[in-house]
Amino acid sequence: MGKNASGKTSLLKLIENVYRILGSFQLEDELMSISGTQLEITFYHENRLFRYETELVRQNNLGKNLSFTQERIFVSDYFKSKSKLIFSPEIYTELKLKRELPDNISILFYILKERKNYAYYYDDLKDQDDMLHAAYDFYKNHGINKKYWKHILHLFDDNIMDLEEINSELFRLTYLDRSMDLSAKELLTMLSSGTIKGIALYTAAIQALQEGSGFIIDEIENHFHKTLVENLISMFKDKAVNKKGAVLIFSTHYCELLDLFGRNDNIWISKSEKQIILTNMYRDYSVRNDLLKSRKFYDDNFGTAVSYEMLMNLKRALMNE
């Protein structure tokens, strides 16, 4: 949660980049300009805790690829009795590893060994044509059951029976009473923007649930009815659905969504002053469990409300025009 320009998107992109490092042991510096960033990543693997430290540096000979410098890895056996000490340096012992890797490959390779996609980032800024192809790719090439695909289509348009990609240029859209072969451009005129984004969102969500992966969404409420957003959150909360422990990480301006959660320690407040700062609702604020979290936001207990004075300044400027 946080105001506009409070750093929420930057934080989610940082989380995505951490997942990329863990999953592929390398990282490209695209639009984030993260060269010079120092990272400390704590993670669990094969009954042990690891703390990884590095500084990301961009080198001209590596193109967009970042090099990993000043790398150190620390390890600790994991016991439930240590759960409150996970971020305490004193429980860790440094691993001495001989580095024999290219500069753009992290020494995490020696620990995790296999590449894996640990998280999906839902990007609704993509071209809608790209979103359609991406959604169908998730369905067809990542083992998503046909019945799940049809349920998703019905969820956003109950007249659609099926949607198939014939080739990279052609789709077959089947309604209750007819089928049509359409180019991607023609298909975009048949489906609403919300339907396309919803199909892409739910297909990626099911993929994350099936794999037990992370699923990252910036501004989860964008373009969707409140009920659909609540349904998506409930799928990740329900252990009967989320059998592999998939993790939903999202930002929102819609504070009523927070009332869906019984706990406070999974809610973070983002603020941007000289730097982006995250505070935890449970740890850093006094929040009574018997009060709606949304009410606390409306009362501006966390300093996240839109400035009334700024709104009035705009209104007065318009009145005086």
Task: State what each model feature region is.
Residues 1-26, 179-308, 314:
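Switch/communication elements of ASCE P-loop NTPase nucleotide-binding domains
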Residues 19-210, 298-308, 317-321:
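Phosphate-coordinating catalytic segments in nucleotide- and nucleic-acid-processing enzymes
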